[in-house]
């Protein structure tokens, strides 16, 4: 069975891993980095992903960041003169990860396990799966990020029973999961979180502070200047990271804008104490889900054996201190917070292929599911933290006499009134026979698969007529849209491949011209003019093709030059070898001649 790669599709950074033997290994990107910025930019019709895209974010307005925060919504982003869905942008990141994983493995990759925040709802999970499909990946499993982290942490501890709390604060989302580990079973007891809390919010606090201070000093509002704001974003992210290791950092942004008197510069010192003060409310927000998860799991703090930190934002000292204060435990730092999720996803891939044995993953649904009933009430069918996959049925009836149809309004959330929860979808069961209210028996069945994706069925028990839908929110894509996007993605991949081949050819041509000119110069007056002339003629032909910018001609002329240059190099080598041989022969003769001069006459006296 072909390899299943594990992908952590993050808000700020993404990573890809693969199982090698029994070890999960992070695959470095072409720049040698183990994580890849989740950034996409467009330039001259070219799609740029990762480090290169992030580097040009300041100067290129067609740059998209933090697209994960829009997954599951109908919001689109404008770039490159077009509108893109979050699924399409995410697919570009996935395609890039897939591409360099294939380069590393030396084979095509078609299957992946992709992670999502535990608190992602159905629409967000479906959007992630669609993004994988657009990127040419069969998504074998959607796994919750804290669960994947627990897999990576606990794979070598299957003989030990323990309860762990995974605290996962990433670039844009926050999750807390509590798991019980033992005998190879990873049982998620509860999960809680906040999809609107992450490292980006900590960056924003610094940005807001810098904008306010600059306005106070110079009377200019930088928040209206897009390029200045991107520079501030980069500086804020760097300052946040610096303050994890030092207590003070200097923010220096020369020529940030211009005033009446000329250019203005931003120079500011940010202390860790000030940063902690600015972000105090964000740190406080992390405490509520911790308490919620413990309560839902029915556990006290003393029953938690280990606290695992996941996500780059858990390096913030104030966050670490808050975790210690809230749990009463020193966090376990045995895993790399940036890499552990992708590694866990690769392990789940190994479980699917059978390469990892005796491991069972029991995950849960993060939010309750149900339907709207009379009076706008939200009636739950499946409670949050129910182990998945699962199925649950309940019988309902009509609200009016002779009601010919029922509307099924499917919701996800925890609030008692339907209007306050997230609508997943609506459908109708029609042709109900005329009868007094309360008589028809309508059975509603919810199914949640192992990926946390919901399907709902309504059945009239009297007529046996039924209606089923796989939930598709208003942000969902139709099969036709996904097919079109897949074709676009394939075309882009083909265009990228051609562009790379073109760059490689131009580099080869430059290298061949340089090397041949050097060889022709070195062989001047060495007695093989015919070969030199042939190489020179081929060189001139290649230069002409290069000037004409004819790629096919360049390829043909490069092959011809390589052949002629090789003939010249052979002659040069033969001449050098003959000279070497002659020199060695002369040295041998000299040594033999000198041997006679070393004979000394001596007298022998007999005693």
From Swiss-Prot:
Keyword Phosphoprotein: yes
GO terms of biological process kind: chaperone cofactor-dependent protein refolding; protein refolding
The keyword DNA damage belongs to this UniProt entry's keyword annotation: no
This protein's UniProt keywords: ATP-binding, Chaperone, Nucleotide-binding, Phosphoprotein, Stress response
Pfam families tied to this protein: HSP70 (PF00012)
Induction description: By stress conditions e.g. heat shock.
Cystine pairs: none
UniProt-annotated stretches for the region Disordered: 580-607
InterPro entries reported for this sequence: ATPase_NBD (IPR043129), Chaperone_DnaK (IPR012725), Heat_shock_70_CS (IPR018181), HSP70_C_sf (IPR029048), HSP70_peptide-bd_sf (IPR029047), Hsp_70_fam (IPR013126)
PROSITE patterns per the UniProt record, alphabetical: HSP70_1, HSP70_2, HSP70_3
Function field: Acts as a chaperone.
Protein name, per record: Chaperone protein DnaK
Native species: Streptococcus pneumoniae (strain ATCC BAA-255 / R6)
Gene: dnaK
